[in-house]
Amino acid sequence: MTAVTYRTCPRTGLQFEGNAEKLMIANAFVAVVFLLIGGILAIGVVLTRWPAIHWLAADTFYQVLTAHGIDMLIFWIIFFEIAVLYFASSTLLRCRLATPNIAWLAFALMLIGAITNNVAVFQGSSSVMMTSYVPMMAAPSFYLGLILFAVGALIACFVFFGTLVVAKREKTYEGSVPLVTFGAITAAIIAVFTIASGAIILIPTFLMSVGLVKEVDPLVYRTVWWAFGHSSQQINVAAHISIWYAVAAIAFGAKPMSERVSRGAFLLYILFLQLASAHHLLADPGLSTGWKVVNTSYFMYFAVLASMIHALSVPGAMEVAQRQKGLTKGLFEWLRKAPWGNPVFSGVIIALFGFGFLGGISGVMMGTEQLNMIIHNTIYVPGHFHATVVVGTTLTFMALTYFLLPVLFRREMINPGLAKYQPYLFGLSMYFFCLVMMGAGTLGVSRRHWDMALSGAALGYEWPGAAYLMMGLVGIAGMAAIVGGGIYIYITVGSLLWGKKLDSGAVSPRFTPVPQAMPGTALQSTGSSGFVAPGSFALTMVFLAAFVLYYFINWKYLSQVWGLS
């Protein structure tokens, strides 16, 4: 058994247990590799959906789209989230990692599964999209890879829970766990439900692919699979909001406005957030109207309430901390004088606004049973989830990486001037990408069809010029975002390869108290800051007004399709 050691970061005061630190580095590094693969594949997707270029042949397009979706939505994000779980438990609670050997087994299963799945897709026999709906079948190794990955991720979640038990037993913290750790617990609980759902439905599908099971009912498959496919985004929501609170503490020394309320919002996520999966099933005939109405109204309102709480609490915490430093002029001096040149802060704040205004509002609209019919299975849907997964989650993870490069990887960032602008290029390009994609979807452009012009089809359809314009803008904005993602890869990998090695800090056989003056203190503490945040309240009211306006605009759109005379 490897001896337990703790390395104290001289820049933050955070302490990294040796085994946990190696696992964080391994999971985060592999995550970035899959982000790179998915980003390269995105070039093919974007240039094919751009009508003026229409690059790839149909077979190649669906192969590339399958790999892009799985690598980005599953492998990149979950590998990174496992690293976040280990950080939120071992580092923030200053304890040893439970069962490091089993944690390495989990990592190996995830890596083998991800590689197996990618090989199956690139061999050309598994272009079934990420959803892989039955009875359309992929190669057995496609399903086997996903199952191995799911099992590994589940094991990693239980290692995280075990680490919480270790911290409690060894009394490495007093009182409640920090809010960031509480948010990570929320993400892990949702992850167990989500990943288990994926494994439950993929196992019989795998057996069907090898001939041991005759049939998997398509409606059962869709219902259970979406408990995995969409609920994986709910893991992301809990994880990236936890990181928002972490960055507020790191950048400003901020505490949540009310820790109890923020924890209550995370609890609402556990109870209700994954029910948002229902919007994918609203056109399915096998589910009752009552089930659809309850899931898309009453239950969804609790999840929306939780998100509104975080929408006020995260910027509010930053505002309170800034006002305590004397930045009290008007509503927004605290925001104007925030560290906009720091990519850790700018990445998070761009992610926060984009996730709320683009992903959140569009998600509530899509989750309303009647309104969903306007945009169901149109390209509006990927416009929405790029606003949540790419703007909200991926940009947040990028911002956290800039913090972790010197702290966890112990490397000085190369080209900090370029890093300063990367969140703006990536984030604002994705803002525009999502907006025009949702606009094209509102006009009815198909979600996945290789050729929006339906060339050669017996029954063609002539889209309005605005639809072609918007899809062209999707291509331009998408390529700009890919450049922004490439800059992130260059800075991250380049810093690991060529960045100056930084002082590792002292190593000791046990954890030690964090000095009060260090940034890690705020990250590991508990407590509330108060409610004096008029600027954040004003921003929240603007968000609410935008939400109400857009919601009723879509009811107007819906009324226009009713005429039958």
Give the role of each language-model region:
Residues Y550-S565:
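Juxtamembrane boundary at the C-terminal end of a transmembrane helix
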Residues Q524-L544:
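Juxtamembrane cytosolic/matrix-side boundary and N-terminal portion
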Residues M72-L73, N236, M541, F547, ...:
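Residues in flexible loops and secondary-structure boundaries
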Residues I349, L428, A538-N554:
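Final/C-terminal transmembrane alpha-helix of multipass membrane proteins
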Residues T2-M518, S536:
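Membrane-embedded and interfacial regions of multi-pass energy-transducing membrane proteins
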Residues P519-L523:
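Intrinsically disordered, low-complexity cytosolic tails and juxtamembrane linkers
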